[in-house]
């Protein structure tokens, strides 16, 4: 009997192990259906850059999706940076694999001679006179700088010393001169990792509040500090026709900006102590003006670490910020200071003041103007015009003022909600002044400016436009607008007097291409490029922007894709995949606005849900998930779960009522905050058959100083954080959920442990869950094999739990 009993136990153990092992897959990479793989790997249209004169077009091919083997190469992750230890460059880049030129007038294309045989180019920039083009070339052990002569179409390497591009890129000084940072020592002599630390790592705080977000890839040890200093210390060099001259001493540069008259530099250098709490851009720093030989002329600021910056929307450190040169003067630096001790809720008439200091920088700073909200920047024009922007993130408000530099007078031109897309006037059209700086272009004797809006949101969908704005009447007149049935926007104003435009035009069936358009002469549009459709798999797939309402009357939209040849009467209702990302609004009217256009060509990236329309699914992409403040006393997130549920119910209902979506076979998915949304919907409703949640944060106690636009802390809104955390309701998640996360996620708040713990919590309560950890991936995925495997995992999840799910009674929200 004992033997039989023992044998029975062995059989049970074997069966248990078999089930467990089968659930783990075999660990190898899988491919999705061919149509999906072909679309992912399709060669995209070239990227385009046009010179200032509108004569030449530079076209480039970008290599997407490197192999996982490339991602697996060594890297240091320190101070918010990811460093290639061999070449003083970022470790993760998408490189340009081909460069060529096209004459816009003739349409003739030109091959570039002298390019490296294996091109890994980046940072392409035109020279001031548009006769040359510079780019970087990255190899395994160094970064070089090349210059293309546009007239001869020849490229030549111009540097003698390898570049260091970790703390900034090269800049054109003039048509024959470039400034760049160089490596000061071979990467091969980087500090070796000690066999053991000298002692424990210690962090301290003595009475100062430091409410910082949960940044990733931070400095964690004295060895990290050594590496940061080694790799980021660089020598500034001036290169004149290939001859290099050192400028100043090696330093850890934060930024280098050349004055419009080319006589000075505005330099920020980082200094110790290096922070273990914030990334490099938050380290202590010096702000100084130097001459072009690197000699200090004026010390402007000695800034502390950002560790003690106050938390909350629109709060800032009590230090000068926003240092920059005025574009309309030879050498005048400007900056901003808070007038409210850095706290926006302080009751003061003005919250910021902007100051200036002109060369030779030996006078007292001059106050230019004050702002009633937070200063957001200025666009310079001439001696009588500049446009000053101010706003409040917390109140979703922005304001543009006219500033007269000669008199100091300011006048409000417009104020709007940042979420009110319909009222967005666009941005000013600029032109280059005598110093080669972009300044506002004025028309009609200086009474009007041109405004370009490449989105052009409207109740009919996005219709980009070019308008004139009257500075006196404060009214806009549309000069040109994209025709309904297409999506076309102004890329460049080629000739303002003739109103000759370079535009980019597309429809839902026609790939984006570039056109020359003459509004005054009303000539027929001339097509400049002839890019072809990379996705024949989507031919005859239908796309429409659908409009519907949720229970409280808020209007919603989404982009509905239906399979090729689908007929609702013949084929019946389809399984549905809804992809979304929540957004907060203070205004229900703003939330209800139409966003996007059904007439845009569908361009796919690695994260798209549209792939699955080729596999027989109705895909509702960009399904709107607004979270709206319901009163002045409430913030949007106070009703997060209820509004999320209403949004989902409305989407399912409209697809069901249209006769295209089977409400009993619906999946929901999202990335990042969309993953957070997905987990919450599965925790609090019974609307879905499955969920796909990628790179999300599920436990809000791990993001205690705010997330997204929520600026209340965990301790100020403990119940809110608890209610919004799907981790706290993991025992309620019985709907199958696929969790995906990059194992090296570098996004604030979305540490991989969020998905790891969510998986364990759901598993521990008997839920159906799978966790896919993608090796070497960040918050956005890059590795070819990883992405193909992820697309296949999503496909098999949808097939198993949605398309082929057993039909049950109609799904209810609760």
Feature locations, PLM:
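Bacterial Sec-dependent N-terminal signal peptides
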Residues: 1-25, 743
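Beta-propeller folds
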Residues: 16, 21-524, 530-540, 555, ...
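Short beta-strand element of the alpha/beta-hydrolase
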Residues: 571-583
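N-terminal cap/lid segment of alpha/beta-hydrolase-fold proteins
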Residues: 529-572
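Active-site glycine-rich loops that stabilize anionic/oxyanionic intermediates
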Residues: 581-586, 597
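Active-site-proximal cap/loop segments of hydrolase catalytic domains
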Residues: 95-97, 104, 597-814
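Conserved hydrophobic/aromatic pocket- or pore-lining residues that grip, position, or stack substrates
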Residues: 287, 333, 413, 514, ...
């Amino acid at each position: 009997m004992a033997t039989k009993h023992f044998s029975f136990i062995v059989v049970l153990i074997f069966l248990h192990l078999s089930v467990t092992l089968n659930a783990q897959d075999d660990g190898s990479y899988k491919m999705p259906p061919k149509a999906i793989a072909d679309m992912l790997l399709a060669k995209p249209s070239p990227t385009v850059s046009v010179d200032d004169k509108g004569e030449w077009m530079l076209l480039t091919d970008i290599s997407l999706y490197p192999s996982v083997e490339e991602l697996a190469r060594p890297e240091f992750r320190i101070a918010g940076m990811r460093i290639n230890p061999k070449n003083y460059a970022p470790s993760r880049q998408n490189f340009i694999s081909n460069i060529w030129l096209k004459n816009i007038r003739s349409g003739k294309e030109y091959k570039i001679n002298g390019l490296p045989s294996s091109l890994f180019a980046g940072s392409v920039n035109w020279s001031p006179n548009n006769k040359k083009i510079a780019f970087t070339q990255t190899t395994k052990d160094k970064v070089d700088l090349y210059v293309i002569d546009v007239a001869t179409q020849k490229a030549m390497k111009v540097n003698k010393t390898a570049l260091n591009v970790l703390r900034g890129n090269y800049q054109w000084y003039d048509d024959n001169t470039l400034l760049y940072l160089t490596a000061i020592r071979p990467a091969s002599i980087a500090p070796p990792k000690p066999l053991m630390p000298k002692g424990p790592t210690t962090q301290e705080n003595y009475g100062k509040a430091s409410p910082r977000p949960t940044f990733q890839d931070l400095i964690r040890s004295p060895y990290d500090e050594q590496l940061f200093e080694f790799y980021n210390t660089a020598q500034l060099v001036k290169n004149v026709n290939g001859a290099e001259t050192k400028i100043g001493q090696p330093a850890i540069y934060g930024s280098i900006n050349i004055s419009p008259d080319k006589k000075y530099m505005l330099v920020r250098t980082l200094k110790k102590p290096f922070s273990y709490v914030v990334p490099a851009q938050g380290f202590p720093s010096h702000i100084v003006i130097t001459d072009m030989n690197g000699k200090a002329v004026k010390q402007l600021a000695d800034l502390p670490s950002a560790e003690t910056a106050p938390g909350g929307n629109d709060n800032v450190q009590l230090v000068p910020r926003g240092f920059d040169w005025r574009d309309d003067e030879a050498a005048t630096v400007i900056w901003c200071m808070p007038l409210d001790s850095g706290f926006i809720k302080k009751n003061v008439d003005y919250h910021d003041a902007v100051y200036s200091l002109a060369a030779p920088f030996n006078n007292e700073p001059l106050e230019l103007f004050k702002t009633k909200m937070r200063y957001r920047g200025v666009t310079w024009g001439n001696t009588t015009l500049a446009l000053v922007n101010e706003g409040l993130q917390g109140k979703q408000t922005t304001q543009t003022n006219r500033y007269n530099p000669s008199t100091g007078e300011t006048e409000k031109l417009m104020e709007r909600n940042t979420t009110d897309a319909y009222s967005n006037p666009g941005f000013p059209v600029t032109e280059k002044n005598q110093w080669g700086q972009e300044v506002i272009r004025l028309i009609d004797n200086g009474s009007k400016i041109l405004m370009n809006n490449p989105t052009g949101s409207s109740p009919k969908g996005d219709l980009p436009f070019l308008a004139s704005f009257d500075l006196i009447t404060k009214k806009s007149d549309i000069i040109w607008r994209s025709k309904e049935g297409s999506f076309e926007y102004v890329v460049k104003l080629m000739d303002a007097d003739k109103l000759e435009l370079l535009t980019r035009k597309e429809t839902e069936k026609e790939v984006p291409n570039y056109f020359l358009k003459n509004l005054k002469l009303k000539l027929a549009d001339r097509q400049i490029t002839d890019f072809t459709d990379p996705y024949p798999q989507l031919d005859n797939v239908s796309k429409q922007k659908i409009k519907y309402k949720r229970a409280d009357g808020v209007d919603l939209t989404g982009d509905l894709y239906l399979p090729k040849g689908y007929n609702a009467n013949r084929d019946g209702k389809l399984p549905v995949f809804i992809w979304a990302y929540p957004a907060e609004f203070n205004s229900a009217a703003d939330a209800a606005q139409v966003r996007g256009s059904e007439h845009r060509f569908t361009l796919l990236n690695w994260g798209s849900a549209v792939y699955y329309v080729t596999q027989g699914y109705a895909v509702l992409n960009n399904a709107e998930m607004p979270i709206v403040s319901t009163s002045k006393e409430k913030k949007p997130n106070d009703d997060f779960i209820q509004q999320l549920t209403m949004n989902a119910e409305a989407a399912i209902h409209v697809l069901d009522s249209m006769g295209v979506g089977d409400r009993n076979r619906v999946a929901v998915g999202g990335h990042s905050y969309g993953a957070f949304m997905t987990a919450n919907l599965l925790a609090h409703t019974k609307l879905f058959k499955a969920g796909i949640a990628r790179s999300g944060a599920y436990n809000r106690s791990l993001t205690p100083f705010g997330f997204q636009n929520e600026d209340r802390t965990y301790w100020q809104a403990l119940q809110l954080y608890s209610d919004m955390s799907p981790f706290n309701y993991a025992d309620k998640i019985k709907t199958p959920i696929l969790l995906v996360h990059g194992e090296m996620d570098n996004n604030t708040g979305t540490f991989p442990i969020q998905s790891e713990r969510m998986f364990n919590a759901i598993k521990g309560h008997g839920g159906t869950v799978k966790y896919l950890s993608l090796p070497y991936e960040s918050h956005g995925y890059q590795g070819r094999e990883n992405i193909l495997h992820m697309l296949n995992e999503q496909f098999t999840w949808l097939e198993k739990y949605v398309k082929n799910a057993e039909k049950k009674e109609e799904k209810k929200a609760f």
